Amino acid sequence: MNGREHRRGDEAARREARSILFQNQDRSIVLIDVPTSIEEAQASPEEVGCDAGPLRKRRRLISSEPPHLPFKTPEPKAGSGGLTESVSDLMIAAAATEALRVLQESYAGPFCLPRVTRPNPLKSAFVPKGSFFLHGTVSSERDRFAAEAPVFDLIVLDPPWPNRSARRKQRNYRVADSLGSIRETLSLIPIAAHLAPDGLLAVWITNKAGVVELLTGPRGLFAQWGLEQVDEWTWLKITTSGEPIVDVGSTWRKPWERILIARRRGSSRKPACRGRVLVSVPDLHSRKPNLRGLFEDVLVPSNKGLEIFARNLTAGWWSWGDEVLKFQQPEYWVES
């Protein structure tokens, strides 16, 4: 079966999430529409897989205009020296380049679905069926979480890693002051007590080397939580024409973010697909694709998931963060 044949053409494919625009045969390369993945997360997986339910009313997420051309990014002057590509960056660049090649050769459709960019506010914030949220910081809600939260098959962390460019842009996007301060915050989360024996932890990370060491080092947070890294995924951001938003060989800026996946030590659980490359046309700043549909093997049949530092809700999941209702607010949605 080639890539074109694998696009949704048969009955099974039609029941897949609309947000998955393409995936190759071994599902190692996935083209995912960011806003649609969040729209689908407002309903249960069963409702997403059929024509009935809330999605039929097409509650739409307000999005930014998708980028049509790559971003301009400065590069060091020739001969400036001092900057070299890490082995990790070279490996990710190779995987990203291969994903772009597969898409070019095997996929002929659009790289993102039509977006709603004009607001038409609803009367109140939307809370998906079966969702539960803690609206507050890790420190303020920790005791309540420890007392009330169940164990989860999947925990997703999207920490506010230190980011000078985010602070410069002043997008009302809160980031930590330093790696030390974010480590202190993450150490407060009782991951070990609330991750199921065969559960997985997925952590969005930046490309800063210190972030990986903070999590995976001998004295890192994974060790503190009794976990071990089992996989790494890449989220590759592209334009509407399929080009990376910046060149994959750029020195100062990379067109990808990464997801580290960990399990309990001694567990045999692994993601169904290893080393995945998720490919998307990006949306609003800090808005990432919802991962629920990509971890079906972990979540079925329980759908017991948790997202920490969440900025939107997911049906059937717990969500926790001081901006947990941000993208559930009326100004971000319309019905069509």
Curated annotation (Swiss-Prot):
Region described as Disordered: spans on this chain: 61-83
Record's catalysed reaction(s): an adenosine in mRNA + S-adenosyl-L-methionine = an N(6)-methyladenosine in mRNA + S-adenosyl-L-homocysteine + H(+)
GO MF: methyltransferase activity; nucleic acid binding
Enzyme's top EC category: transferase
KO phenotype (gene knockout): Drastically lowers the m6A level of APHA mRNA and reduced its expression. Significantly decreases the methylation level of the ZAP1 mRNA. Exhibits a growth rate defect and displays an irregular colony margin. Leads to a significant decrease in sporulation. Also significantly reduces virulence on chestnut stems and red Fuji apples. Displays more sensitivity to both oxidative stress, osmotic stress, or cell wall integrity stress.
Disulfide bonds: none
This protein's record includes keyword Nucleus: no
EC annotation from Swiss-Prot or TrEMBL: 2.1.1.348
A Gene Ontology biological process term: methylation
Keywords: Methyltransferase, RNA-binding, S-adenosyl-L-methionine, Sporulation, Transferase, Virulence
One Pfam family matching this protein: MT-A70
Alphabetized InterPro entries for the sequence: DNA_methylase_N6_adenine_CS, MT-A70-like, SAM-dependent_MTases_sf
Stated induction or repression of this protein's expression: Transcription level is decreased by CHV1 virus infection.
Presence of keyword RNA-binding: yes
Cellular component, GO, one term: nucleus
Function as written in the Swiss-Prot or TrEMBL entry: N6-methyladenosine RNA methyltransferase that plays a crucial role in fungal phenotypic traits, virulence, and stress tolerance. Mediates the methylation of mRNAs to produce N6-methyladenosine (m6A)-containing mRNAs. M6A is a modification present at internal sites of mRNAs and some non-coding RNAs and plays a role in mRNA stability and processing. Mediates specifically acid phosphatase APHA mRNA stability through a YTHDF1-dependent m6A modification of the A1306, A1341, and A1666 key methylation modification sites.
Family recorded in the similarity comment: Belongs to the MT-A70-like family.
PANTHER family found in the cross-reference section: N(6)-ADENINE-SPECIFIC METHYLTRANSFERASE METTL4, N6-ADENOSINE-METHYLTRANSFERASE
UniProt-recorded name of the protein: N6-methyladenosine RNA methyltransferase MTA1
Originating gene: MTA1
